[in-house]
Regions:
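N-terminal secretory signal peptides that target proteins for export/translocation
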Residues: 1-15
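Short linear/disordered segments characteristic of secreted peptide precursors
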Residues: 8, 22-23
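Sec-dependent signal peptide hydrophobic core
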Residues: 15-22
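Cleavable N-terminal signal peptides
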Residues: 23-24, 34-35
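Extracytoplasmic copper-binding redox domains, predominantly the cupredoxin/blue-copper superfamily
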Residues: 35-254
Length: 254
């Protein structure tokens, strides 16, 4: 019996290719910028970003949502809130946030509130900081469930039953940034959105499309406006100490 010393040419080729692939992957990772973790600092003379998000042209003609369950309480139909446009074209329920800010004010002390009310979620759109939590409750005398999912993969985060009016529970949010889609399986028209960010510099537009972000450290930032149907658009803002930077972002209906 003869022993086999050394590797065959095929094995040697495999080892060389695998080593090259590993080196290439490490080089690619090293070339990507690494964002610093958010640092909480005292903001003594911060500025404010104040602005409005508008919808270009006329809002799409959305038809009322047909109610398929609990009509005795929810009614026969519910207005579709996807495009809610106020005076002057102001667009409601747009999440506006600063991009890649690495230090500033502390996270909100209180959990988010997500209420099942009148067979809809309220609020429909809101921001959150990674590491936070959400208080889920129901003001309706019908069975709801609150089912948040990763918006990209549809993976379930958890699924909470709310069996009666006044029921509430507080749950942690995922530990990484991203968009969360919330639905009620019992009432398929019920949707909400939570944008988890690594910092607390975000706001949701009101009925007139207006938003305000306070206590911003001086600097130049990219401001992002995100809407569930119209997509997102960015603006550049320069924040000076103790001053207010104005912004107007216009989205187009899709």
């Amino acid at each position: 019996m003869h022993s086999r010393i050394g590797a065959t040419p095929r094995l040697q080729s495999f080892v060389i290719c695998a080593s090259a692939a590993i080196v290439g992957a490490l080089a690619l990772l090293a070339s990507r910028p690494v964002l610093a973790a958010y640092e909480t600092v005292t903001v003594t003379n911060g500025g404010t970003v104040d602005g409005v998000v508008t919808l270009s042209g006329t809002a799409p003609n959305v038809v009322p949502i047909k109610v398929t369950k609990n009509q005795d309480y929810c009614g026969a139909s519910i207005p579709d809130p996807t495009y809610t446009v106020g005076a002057g074209g102001g667009l409601e329920n747009v999440l506006v946030y600063l991009k890649d800010i690495t230090k500033g004010k502390a996270a909100p002390a209180e959990p988010l509130a997500l209420v099942n009310e009148h067979c809809m979620f309220s609020p429909r759109v809101q921001g959150a900081m990674v590491g936070g939590s959400v208080k889920i409750s129901s003001n309706d005398p019908v069975l709801h469930n609150t089912h948040p999912q990763n918006a990209e993969t549809n993976a379930t985060i958890y699924n909470i039953a709310l069996p009666f009016k006044g029921f509430s529970v507080t749950k942690p949010l995922p530990g990484s940034p991203g968009l969360i889609k919330v639905k009620c399986d019992a009432h398929e028209w019920m949707h909400a959105w939570i944008m988890e960010l690594e910092h607390p510099y975000y706001a949701t537009t009101g009925a007139d499309g207006h938003f305000t972000i306070k206590d911003v450290p001086p600097g130049t930032y990219t401001l992002v406006a995100w809407h569930e149907a119209a997509g997102e658009k960015s603006d550049s803002v320069v924040v000076a100490a103790g001053q207010t930077a104005k912004s107007k972002i216009t989205l187009t209906a899709k």
